[in-house]
């Protein structure tokens, strides 16, 4: 990727990469190799504009790839509403693949806002579908890490009256906050209602929260739907799928140390949840990192003037993921 500044118009031309992890789609901007001199206000404005599906490219967020003093690279993610997220599992898979190919390595360590993660190449989850694994170890059930104002140190299968009297939630932090409820049937309207409450009831959740409903299909398959903080109802949220896997193991719906197929509206991933002798959780998080198209975006004083896209380079892997998606629909019922 490279930057081209047209002196006559003060327009900065930025190359972009559209990518997705299980349908959770992003625009990737490479600040590692290019000094764009973007400040956070500009990053926020880019996210709000570029993620608008009606007017621009559309997406759930912007992935900024930067240099790191402690890892191979750093990921920052700004949601579609302009807020910055601490972590995004689906986005991290895309950034991980990008940095792996950029540095010609088999694995890389990526710094995020509050932690760091190893990302490793894996055998394709489906023919032609590029796949990586993230080692997720930054897991906490302490309500202070969300933060959540609750009477006990942990919230495990209990109600939060301010949000709902119907569902039993478990609180999990994977550097970003999650409330997980295991349900018999996923009601999207109720999920949205609770998700909105969870992000507006600051007395309970001062920094908001991601809310997920989990339907257990059988002892090795679950289906997850998520209301994502800063996004809304989403096809996929990587850390929500990770948190849902942990909660499903705690509830003895699936087993620790066994592969779990986690389905959602965007496709499927695999997880393996581990619990050590000290009660600490870690997760192998395995899924696609699909590149969709390359393009350019012209930026004039934080305002996007126009953009172009070229879908030809990644057409084959996009088609492969579409085949994989149809395959997952047959197996998640």
From Swiss-Prot:
Gene3D superfamilies: Diaminopimelate Epimerase, Chain A, domain 1. GO terms for biological process: lysine biosynthetic process via diaminopimelate. It is found in: Cytoplasm. It is an enzyme of class 5 (isomerase). Pathway: Amino-acid biosynthesis; L-lysine biosynthesis via DAP pathway; DL-2,6-diaminopimelate from LL-2,6-diaminopimelate: step 1/1. PROSITE patterns: DAP_EPIMERASE. Keywords: Amino-acid biosynthesis, Cytoplasm, Isomerase, Lysine biosynthesis. The record marks 178, 228 as: Could be important to modulate the pK values of the two catalytic cysteine residues. Its EC number is 5.1.1.7. Homodimer. Catalyzes the stereoinversion of LL-2,6-diaminopimelate (L,L-DAP) to meso-diaminopimelate (meso-DAP), a precursor of L-lysine and an essential component of the bacterial peptidoglycan. NCBIfam families: DapF. PANTHER family: DIAMINOPIMELATE EPIMERASE, DIAMINOPIMELATE EPIMERASE, CHLOROPLASTIC. This is Diaminopimelate epimerase. It comes from Clostridium acetobutylicum (strain ATCC 824 / DSM 792 / JCM 1419 / IAM 19013 / LMG 5710 / NBRC 13948 / NRRL B-527 / VKM B-1787 / 2291 / W). The lineage of its organism: Bacteria, Bacillati, Bacillota, Clostridia, Eubacteriales.
